[in-house]
């Protein structure tokens, strides 16, 4: 799960860093371990999806959490038109899987190679006056705090945390 001697580059290779550690969790338990290990070792943490941003926002000399393998659909509710998905899921893979359940995202950005987390946290948007950015489609989230605890938030429960978490 953690690699040694680290180098990370974004997709365009115009941003790179040498973090002290890279974690690649595949489930919530490993993700939580990654954050708690960083806390224990007084390391800063940055999370990345596909690295499809041109900016240096993902760069760190602390711990980098690579979410590319944290990419499963956990549940689908066609009656509510809702899906629960791990944030490393690429949009290019999410769309056809939603289609298999008779669902689709109401709005997509221009880049399908982004992860769900990247598209949401960077304010990715499509077109049209009636469509918000992808973050407006998020109705609930599980957030790991700086203390290493999981907090659930939604538009009903802790709505301020949800709004802060989705475009960050």
Model regions and ranges:
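N-terminal regions that are enriched for targeting/export leaders
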Residues: 2-12
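Short coil/turn linker and secondary-structure boundary residues
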Residues: 6, 26, 89, 156-157
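Broad hydrophobic/π-residue packing in well-ordered secondary structure
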Residues: 10, 91, 161-164
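Glycine-rich N-terminal segment of FAD-binding domains in flavoprotein oxidoreductases
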Residues: 16-110, 123-128
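Short secondary-structure boundary/hinge segments and terminal tails
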Residues: 55-57, 115-118, 132
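Short, acidic, Ser/Thr-enriched surface-loop or helix-capping motifs
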Residues: 78, 115, 145
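An acidic, phosphate/nucleotide-engaging active-site surface
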Residues: 93, 115-117, 139
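FAD-binding subdomain of flavoenzyme oxidoreductases
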Residues: 107, 119-168
